[in-house]
Amino acid sequence: MTASPHPAADMLPKSWDPAAMESAIYQKWLDAGYFTADPTSTKPAYSIVLPPPNVTGSLHMGHALEHTMMDALTRRKRMQGYEVLWQPGTDHAGIATQSVVEQQLAVDGKTKEDLGRELFVDKVWDWKRESGGAIGGQMRRLGDGVDWSRDRFTMDEGLSRAVRTIFKRLYDAGLIYRAERLVNWSPVLQTAISDLEVNYRDVEGELVSFRYGSLDDSQPHIVVATTRVETMLGDTAIAVHPDDERYRHLVGTSLAHPFVDRELAIVADEHVDPEFGTGAVKVTPAHDPNDFEIGVRHQLPMPSILDTKGRIVDTGTRFDGMDRFEARVAVRQALAAQGRVVEEKRPYLHSVGHSERSGEPIEPRLSLQWWVRVESLAKAAGDAVRNGDTVIHPASMEPRWFSWVDDMHDWCISRQLWWGHRIPIWYGPDGEQVCVGPDETPPQGWEQDPDVLDTWFSSALWPFSTLGWPDKTAELEKFYPTSVLVTGYDILFFWVARMMMFGTFVGDDAAITLDGRRGPQVPFTDVFLHGLIRDESGRKMSKSKGNVIDPLDWVEMFGADALRFTLARGASPGGDLAVSEDAVRASRNFGTKLFNATRYALLNGAAPAPLPSPNELTDADRWILGRLEEVRAEVDSAFDGYEFSRACESLYHFAWDEFCDWYLELAKTQLAQGLTHTTAVLAAGLDTLLRLLHPVIPFLTEALWLALTGRESLVSADWPEPSGISVDLVAAQRINDMQKLVTEVRRFRSDQGLADRQKVPARMHGVRDSDLSNQVAAVTSLAWLTEPGPDFEPSVSLEVRLGPEMNRTVVVELDTSGTIDVAAERRRLEKELAGAQKELASTAAKLANADFLAKAPDAVIAKIRDRQRVAQQETERITTRLAALQ
């Protein structure tokens, strides 16, 4: 080697230790203020709001995926010269946080009622200040480049003001109202809960079929079936399909209730499926969503038979006071005693909604609640996408968006909790009510509504409330609308749709239009929807399956860069992502490869310098620089389209398969030949590669780039621009032919039993005709060959077809005599053959197992088929080689 080592070569350790380096690098970024956004900047703006995680929680693998993608987007835009705001914050998580504090009180034998509302809320604030910061530390460990100076909480005073402001505007516009309607009720928490807080799972229950009306088959009667037989105490009708001939003569009549002094109207309703069961359904309007709709259509009575704790009430029967599950048995037994039970299926597997927080089956229940009238709001949210004001990525998710917003039901926004934004409605002594805005004072002696708002209400204001709305602020002017929302497709309705509804509702507000200097705005111009994280078998992660992985565990094992690269590499738009420890280990190995390549380049003098003119560059130089430009363009295209997987795959294969595996090896040959300009090409390639990788692998690239360039930080470095270097097709073909020739010679050597790097004399024919004269030194070095001596006698040879049309031939003759221990080679091959045959038998057995094929995910079966194919090829190769050694 003729080049001197780079002065910074000794600055790098001999190996990369993420645990020792990443936290220090992150602190350096914070101290330098790289992530602090300046609303007075003249740079173009780019802004993202972080979907606020629950203050009670910790980062799960879905968060890690989401944060990796947002960090990659903002880091790239910062390097492209944008003024970037990545807005962090946490959600007050009403039910979750109240539950945590109530559990702490329970340890001391106390309840929230013992403290009273005001002291309990103070207690929750104390908990938040002491224990609510865990997520921030985890985000730092992951490398999130958020603006911590702007960290917000959905119960901050500024955000509370925004909540009260929009509530009053919606109320004054007639879009918030109070009504008794059906909700998901949690008897344990004693509050309404949102659909998102209901988890459905299959349970083994019972299906009871019983008859209303006469026990005499010749007299009017109808058989119905239910899994919640206790709700028959609230039945007010029986519904049949209008075209069902079996019941047409009964429509308009009624049947007596066996336990309650009530006649059950027989109504015709198209909701009923005449092909299912008996074609007749019991109607309990106060305790079933479909029955409620039937009740509204037919103006049925809606008696509520369950109290807030799930006990039977107000039926006037002996069942009053019973728990719902106790009543289920008692009512069934009472029906059986009358001879009304026709059939009992037990166990009967069916799906039941359970409270995510408290775990018990939820109860649909008629309840007086506050609601948002969504029709006009949902239409505006839908129109924003139809008109192109907001673009959803991938486009395949648009139908799901429209299916939500075009068929949205009014939104229940009240919760029977103490922790949260209190509903700003006040009641007078004679039942009067008034909505009190943030700058108004309630009438003396009036009482405030005890309920709080659904957590999703305040988080729906997140894109603009965090920027200071309803006040006119420099942040709203600079960073609103936000550039892109990155979130999971699973909360498209619960969060995204509601942000769009509220965002379009205030879109023409003076604080947002800048007093009319710009038109109405949407909350974000792009929405990128990512998929869910699954385990390596393709199963959704859940605590019940025991397959949940803490991302911080993998960060500790492999480093944040390795986890981030794994997640980004697997993240295709809208597609789910399977992760495994092996995948993260492979990403760690990729980082090690980059580290070793950079260290090697520095030790051999790589340093930024002007590149020589193209005619001074070698084929290898022109090839690698041309490929680098192609990769840069592909990475730009991929990031612009939120195709993180495509960007990472392109960078991975270029860095590993082309730059490290080929160009570095060719650079050794060039440096040995005295081509000192090679150090500039090495540095140029590494410089651009590290910049392109930085958004996804920020820590390692920062350390390597600083060593290479001696400059301030990659965070503030420029993003690679088009280099103007086009692909030299002639040089690229020569390199492609050289690579094929080296690969074929190496494979042939292996088949001959030669060890890697064991040099043997060889002679090549047809090199000049194949336009490879300038590549002989590279082939000789990389294929571990030596020049033939005067007494060279070839013992084996191979032909390699080259050229774009495979019409050029290079013949390589090798003298392997005396280089192979035949007996030892046979023993080695026989051992390999036994292993290949064992793998072949194992995979064949699995693929012949019908039970396994029926249950295993397609991805697992595909992997086994691949293993079988490889084992078959290995068996054939080794068998052929053994035969040649006879």
Swiss-Prot record:
Its EC number is 6.1.1.9. GO terms for molecular function: aminoacyl-tRNA deacylase activity; ATP binding; valine-tRNA ligase activity. Signal peptide: none annotated. GO terms for biological process: valyl-tRNA aminoacylation. One of its GO terms (cellular component) is plasma membrane. CDD domains: Anticodon_Ia_Val, ValRS_core. It comes from the Bacteria. Residues 819-851 form a coiled coil. Its main location: cytoplasm. Keywords: Aminoacyl-tRNA synthetase, ATP-binding, Coiled coil, Cytoplasm, Ligase, Nucleotide-binding, Protein biosynthesis. ATP binds at residue 543. It is found in: Cytoplasm. It catalyses: tRNA(Val) + L-valine + ATP = L-valyl-tRNA(Val) + AMP + diphosphate. Gene3D superfamilies: HUPs, Isoleucyl-tRNA Synthetase, Domain 1, Valyl-tRNA synthetase, C-terminal domain, Valyl/Leucyl/Isoleucyl-tRNA synthetase, editing domain. It holds the Pfam family tRNA-synt_1. A motif ('KMSKS' region) lies at residues 540-544. Monomer. Catalyzes the attachment of valine to tRNA(Val). As ValRS can inadvertently accommodate and process structurally similar amino acids such as threonine, to avoid such errors, it has a 'posttransfer' editing activity that hydrolyzes mischarged Thr-tRNA(Val) in a tRNA-dependent manner. Belongs to the class-I aminoacyl-tRNA synthetase family. ValS type 1 subfamily. ValRS has two distinct active sites: one for aminoacylation and one for editing. The misactivated threonine is translocated from the active site to the editing site. This is Valine--tRNA ligase. It comes from Mycobacterium tuberculosis (strain ATCC 25618 / H37Rv).
